[in-house]
Amino acid sequence: MNTPENSYEQFLEPYLPSTTDRCFVTVTYAQSLDARIACAPGERTKLSGADTKRMTHFLRSKHDAILVGIDTVIADNPRLNCRYPTMAEDYNSPLSPQPVFLDTHFRWDFTKDWALLRSSTSKKPLIITESKNSGKIASYIEFGGEVLQVQDIRNWTEIARGLYSLGYTSVMVEGGAKVIDSCLTSGIADSVIITIAPVFLGTNGLAAAPSHAITFSEPRWWRSEGVPDTICAMKCDPISMK
């Protein structure tokens, strides 16, 4: 257990991206004491406090890309930028990672008013998709976006290799539940960083968990006086990508 004098920046150092010869994968999310990430599917639920939210933005500043599933995009309309260190609502750090959407059938309507497109400094998301809709793909590329077509959107080795081929050496996987479950189950994650809020969401809550048991190495816990949340950070042994 860390002392209050130790910052989360120091605590997280061993779990940050540490390789450039492949795409380093970090899975990070906030959950309740009963391992729920939301009160119900599709319902946005605030779990992180101000301090651990700032920690999330610190992590974003350390990654090339930030990845979420299309259901999370539609439900939450996130900005997916980095506001560290100021945390000002109108601040968009030059360290903001590249947004990446997992969108099997390319459902995202980029012509609508999305939060992450409102700033002139915002980065248009990279769409990872199985879709062969050449018209929509061409329109999005003309719009200024980028598309990575994959054979199987559940194949995280293919996703990581694709990201690396585009120059991304690290990706932060933030959600939602299906994406977290799939990524953890694949065994490709290098680090897992979980914020645990002091609340139960109940059996109707949306859980995030892999489909089988996973043992992590070097687990560490961080707490600080006056901060209600706890952070658990762990290392994984990623599958071979060679």
Q: Which sequence ranges carry the predicted segments?
A:
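Enzymes that bind and transform nitrogen-containing heteroaromatic metabolites
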Residues: 1-242
